[in-house]
A protein has these predicted regions:
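Short active-site oxyanion
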Residues: 71-75, 140-142, 163
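Short active-site segment of divalent metal-dependent hydrolases/proteases
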Residues: 40, 150-151
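Active-site-proximal alpha-helix that buttresses catalytic centers in soluble enzyme cores
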Residues: 1-94, 114, 128
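Domain-level recognition of soluble alpha/beta enzyme cores
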Residues: 162-186, 196
Length: 212
C-alpha cells in the first residue's frame, strides 16, 4: 500500500511526471544500448585481439535474440574482434566506429592493468560518439557494442561522476541504456543481463581471466 493520501488519479499523474523527468515514454527520445562484448577469455589463445570463446558465442546468441526483438535502427561496434563477433550475432549490417574501442592498456608482471589513455580522453570520444548517433538516429533505438572501461567512461560522463569513483564493471553482453532528448541525458539501466541464464555466465566473473 502506498503511504500517501492522494487519490489514484493524482498518483498516476505524479508517476507519469516522474517517468517523463527520466525520459521514460517521452516522444522523440533516442535510446542507446551500450553493450559490452561477449566473453573472449575462457579459452583464449590469442592475446592481442582475441575472438569470442565458445561461452562468448553462446552469450552473443542470447543477446541477439533480445536485441532483435527490440528492433534497433542500427548496430554500431568497436573494430576489435570480440566486439565485431558479438555484433555479427545480431546483424551483418554493422557500423564500425573506432571511438567504441577499449582504453588502450598493458598488463604488468604482477597482473595490474595499466591504461594508456586518460579517463578524460575516453569520455570525450564516447560523448562525441553518442552525439553523432543522436544526430543520425534521433528518436530511435540504437545498439553500440563496446568495452568495459569505455562504457563506464560514457556512463560516468552522463552521471557527472569521476570514473575512478564508480566501482562497477558491466558484465559480458550486459546492456546499459542511455536516453537522450535535446541536451538532456539520462542513464536508464546499468548492466542488464536478463537475457543470460545461469549456464551462460562466465565463471571467472565480469573481467574474465585477465582484462576488460
Amino acid at each position: 500500500m502506498l503511504a500517501v493520501t492522494a487519490g489514484s488519479e493524482q498518483i498516476r499523474r505524479a508517476m507519469q511526471a516522474l517517468e517523463a523527468a527520466f525520459l521514460i515514454g517521452v516522444e522523440g527520445v533516442t535510446e542507446i544500448w551500450l553493450v559490452r562484448h561477449a566473453d573472449c577469455y575462457q579459452d583464449m589463445e590469442e592475446a592481442e585481439d582475441p575472438p569470442l570463446s565458445a561461452l562468448g558465442r553462446a552469450q552473443a546468441q542470447r543477446l541477439a535474440e533480445r536485441v532483435k526483438r527490440a528492433g534497433p535502427a542500427a548496430v554500431y561496434a568497436s573494430p576489435f574482434r570480440r566486439a565485431l563477433e558479438t555484433a555479427r550475432a545480431i546483424t551483418d549490417e554493422i557500423k564500425v566506429d573506432p571511438r567504441l574501442v577499449e582504453m588502450p592498456l598493458d598488463i604488468s608482471e604482477d597482473g595490474t592493468l595499466e591504461f594508456h589513455e586518460t579517463a578524460e580522453s575516453a569520455t570525450a570520444r564516447m560523448r562525441a560518439m553518442v552525439e553523432d548517433i543522436v544526430r543520425e538516429h534521433e528518436g530511435k533505438r540504437v545498439v553500440a557494442i563496446s568495452h568495459g572501461a569505455a562504457i563506464i567512461a560514457c556512463l560516468t560522463d552522463v552521471l557527472n561522476v569521476d570514473p575512478g569513483r564508480l566501482r562497477l564493471l558491466p558484465y559480458y553482453t550486459s546492456i546499459s541504456t542511455l536516453r537522450v532528448l535535446g541536451d538532456r541525458r539520462m542513464v536508464g539501466t546499468f548492466g542488464d543481463i536478463a537475457h543470460l541464464e545461469a549456464d551462460s555466465l562466465s565463471p571467472s566473473g565480469a573481467f574474465g581471466a585477465t582484462s576488460p
